[in-house]
């Protein structure tokens, strides 16, 4: 059965607090960008469609290259906020497009949208078609300048909303949210309780425990003590979500700082409305249908005194009053927040459920480098615990870092101070460390790697690496071979049971099996312009202090003497010496006067 779930991942935040030229959601934790962690979790839910809303083209490029089945949609630079981000995805939820081959449309302003053929007064709950249940049974139209992309075609009935900068949401929680029926509700959000909720949106409930609204931290009154916070994760009925976002966008446009205060002409027929002369700059219209602090936007503080006055002056639902935007200066970008729909639903008698979790540290977003480090530490602890339960011995979890992309086998031993990253794979019985750094490499069975750095290389079964060896990209170390202390190897093949024990540089070389490279050998592979290859055949024994000037070839079973400089090829089984006659001067030190 095809899934009825669509997933929208919001990745359009500017991330200014990261103080980085890299988009926030592309910052790595445990080997992957934050957005990749979110996408990996989302894909496990097997949705019929996944959409990422982006602003920076680098985010789009990464997703196109890494997750080709994910649709990417550009969020306009003209309007900000999570509400508009989700709104941007609605047409593509309803389209027949699957995967990012569908052309992205960057909407430059809200003027590009034709949001049903109705007036701005539809932001009044009294006239809202959410009250008309029959109107929600069929499809709705959303148009862009490029034409109708929906055409009343069937579309996913539920939308799960995730954030690209919240990478640690447990899959079990998402699974519960998706599988739990909405019943009589139009959606459900995930909440958690914090001892110090400062900086997070608070969940306000009515006397019956129903969620009434989400209040931004800056709008919390001193007497309000609320420690239940909104995590941002939520699931909504697609039709209700679309309808609410349509109306809220209209209100947002109508009440932006560049618009005049709502006049009588803007109000619903036969409804009272406060006129312009009663308004002040940057005022909005708000419904006065409830006695509690329910407004269209949780950006604005509405005191009990204002509502008591509203209750006395306006007794029937759908009437409007002007209010002063007491925090307008704090919201200079005029964001359209997704959280506004919670109050909007409540004002229309529609319920939003909640799932409350105690895993608060897994649901808080990353906004700066401090939170980035904290999040990576949490994820690293999870990764280490998982591998320990799988059968990997990790002697010092506190000093070990393992990327989420690393693969380990049973009975691997990891000693203190190790960093394993990228697409590294380590086979059974390997001993890693102490103080080894391995990235994007294969480490075979029963291999020993101690105090070494290995990058993009392959180490076959039984090899011994280190201490203090540096294995660079493109290197293959054969079975049961040895690379010893202070050896650097680059772009070379070392055959089975060969040894490079100490103090050597091997570059661009092919070394056969059962070869012994003497101490202090240098493969001079660079002529100032080009790199050249050195070939050492099976069974060769080289003396200490040799220099091989590439290109050069040494035949099978040949020997070289200590201190030799090999510039010409050596035939099989030969001995090659660079012989300089030794001259000894008797009593030289005495004659020099050294005493």
Curated annotation (Swiss-Prot):
Co-factor note (free text): Binds 1 Mg(2+) ion per subunit.
Function description: Catalyzes the last two sequential reactions in the de novo biosynthetic pathway for UDP-N-acetylglucosamine (UDP-GlcNAc). The C-terminal domain catalyzes the transfer of acetyl group from acetyl coenzyme A to glucosamine-1-phosphate (GlcN-1-P) to produce N-acetylglucosamine-1-phosphate (GlcNAc-1-P), which is converted into UDP-GlcNAc by the transfer of uridine 5-monophosphate (from uridine 5-triphosphate), a reaction catalyzed by the N-terminal domain.
UniProt keywords, alphabetically: Acyltransferase, Cell shape, Cell wall biogenesis/degradation, Cytoplasm, Magnesium, Metal-binding, Multifunctional enzyme, Nucleotidyltransferase, Peptidoglycan synthesis, Repeat, Transferase
The protein's required cofactors: Mg(2+)
EC number: 2.7.7.23, 2.3.1.157
Stretches for region Linker: 370-390
N-acetyltransferase: region residues: 391-595
Binding site for acetyl-CoA: 519, 525-526, 562
Subcellular localization, as worded in the UniProt entry: Cytoplasm
UniProt-annotated catalytic positions: 502 (proton acceptor)
InterPro entries: Bifunctional_GlmU, GlmU-like, GlmU_C_LbH, Hexapep, MobA-like_NTP_Trfase, Nucleotide-diphossugar_trans, Trimer_LpxA-like_sf
The protein, known as: Bifunctional protein GlmU
Biological processes per GO annotation: cell morphogenesis; cell wall organization; lipid A biosynthetic process; peptidoglycan biosynthetic process; regulation of cell shape; UDP-N-acetylglucosamine biosynthetic process
Residue sites binding UDP-N-acetyl-alpha-D-glucosamine per the record: 10-13, 24, 75, 81-82, 201, 216, 230, 367, 472, 490, 505, 516
Reactions catalysed according to its record: alpha-D-glucosamine 1-phosphate + acetyl-CoA = N-acetyl-alpha-D-glucosamine 1-phosphate + CoA + H(+); N-acetyl-alpha-D-glucosamine 1-phosphate + UTP + H(+) = UDP-N-acetyl-alpha-D-glucosamine + diphosphate
Assembly and interaction partners: Homotrimer.
Superkingdom of the organism of origin: Bacteria
CDD domains given in the database record: LbH_GlmU_C
Binding site for Mg(2+): 165, 367
Family label: In the N-terminal section; belongs to the N-acetylglucosamine-1-phosphate uridyltransferase family.
GO cellular component, one term: cytoplasm
Pathway participation: Nucleotide-sugar biosynthesis; UDP-N-acetyl-alpha-D-glucosamine biosynthesis; N-acetyl-alpha-D-glucosamine 1-phosphate from alpha-D-glucosamine 6-phosphate (route II): step 2/2; Nucleotide-sugar biosynthesis; UDP-N-acetyl-alpha-D-glucosamine biosynthesis; UDP-N-acetyl-alpha-D-glucosamine from N-acetyl-alpha-D-glucosamine 1-phosphate: step 1/1; Bacterial outer membrane biogenesis; LPS lipid A biosynthesis
């Amino acid at each position: 059965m095809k899934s009825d779930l669509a997933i929208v991942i919001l990745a359009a935040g500017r991330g200014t607090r990261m103080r980085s030229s890299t988009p926030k959601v592309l910052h790595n934790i445990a080997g992957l960008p934050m957005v990749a962690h979110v996408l990996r979790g989302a894909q496990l839910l097997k949705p019929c469609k996944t959409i990422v809303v982006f602003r920076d083209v680098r985010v789009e490029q990464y997703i196109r290259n890494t997750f080709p089945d994910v649709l990417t949609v550009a969020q306009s630079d003209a309007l900000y906020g999570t509400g508009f981000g989700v709104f941007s995805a609605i047409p593509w939820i309803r389209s027949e497009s699957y995967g990012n081959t569908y052309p992205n449309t960057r909407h430059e302003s809200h003027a590009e949208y034709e949001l049903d053929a109705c007036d701005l007064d539809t932001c009044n709950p009294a006239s809202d078609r959410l009250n008309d249940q029959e109107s929600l049974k069929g499809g709705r139209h959303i148009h862009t300048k490029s034409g109708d992309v929906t055409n009343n075609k069937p579309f996913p009935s539920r939308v799960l909303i995730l954030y690209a900068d919240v990478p640690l949401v447990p899959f079990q929680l998402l699974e519960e949210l998706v599988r739990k029926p909405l019943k009589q509700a139009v959606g459900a959000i995930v909440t958690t309780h914090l001892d110090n909720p400062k900086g997070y949106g608070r969940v306000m409930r009515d006397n019956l425990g129903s969620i009434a609204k989400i209040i931004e931290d800056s709008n919390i009154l001193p007497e309000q003590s609320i420690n239940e916070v909104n995590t941002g994760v939520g699931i909504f009925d697609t039709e209700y979500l679309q309808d609410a976002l349509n109306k809220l966008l209209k209100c947002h446009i109508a009440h932006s700082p560049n618009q005049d205060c709502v006049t009588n002409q803007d109000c619903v027929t036969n409804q009272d409305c406060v006129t312009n002369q009663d308004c002040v700059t940057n005022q909005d219209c708000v419904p006065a249908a409830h006695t509690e602090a329910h407004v269209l936007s949780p950006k604005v503080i509405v005191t009990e005194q204002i509502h008591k006055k509203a209750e006395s002056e306006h007794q029937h639902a759908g009437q409007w009053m002007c209010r002063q935007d007491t925090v307008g200066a704090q919201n200079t970008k005029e964001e359209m927040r997704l959280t506004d729909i919670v109050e909007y639903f409540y004002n229309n008698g529609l319920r939003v459920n909640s799932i409350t979790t105690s895993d608060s540290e897994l649901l808080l977003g990353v906004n700066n480098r401090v939170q980035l480090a904290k999040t990576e530490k949490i994820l690293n602890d999870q990764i280490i615990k998982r591998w320990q339960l799988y059968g990997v011995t990790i002697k010092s979890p506190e000093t070990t870092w393992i990327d989420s992309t690393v693969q380990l086998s049973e009975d691997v031993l990891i000693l203190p101070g190790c960093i394993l990253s990228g697409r590294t794979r380590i086979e059974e019985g390997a001993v890693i460390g102490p103080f080894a750094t391995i990235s994007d490499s294969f480490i075979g069975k029963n291999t020993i790697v101690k105090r070494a750095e290995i990058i993009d290389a392959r180490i076959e079964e039984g090899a011994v690496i280190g201490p203090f060896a540096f294995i660079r990209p493109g290197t293959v170390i054969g079975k049961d071979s040895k690379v010893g202390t202070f050896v650097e190897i680059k772009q070379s093949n070392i055959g089975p049971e060969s040894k490079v024990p100490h103090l050597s540089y091997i570059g661009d070389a092919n070394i056969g099996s059962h070869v012994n490279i003497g101490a202090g050998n240098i493969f001079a592979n660079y002529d100032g312009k080009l790199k050249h290859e050195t070939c050492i055949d099976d069974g060769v024994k080289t003396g200490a202090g040799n220099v091989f000037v590439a290109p050069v070839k040494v035949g099978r079973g040949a020997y070289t003497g200590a201190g030799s400089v090999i510039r010409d090829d050596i035939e099989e089984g030969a001995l090659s010496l660079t012989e300089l006659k030794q001259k000894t001067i008797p009593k030289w030190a005495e004659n020099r006067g050294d005493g």
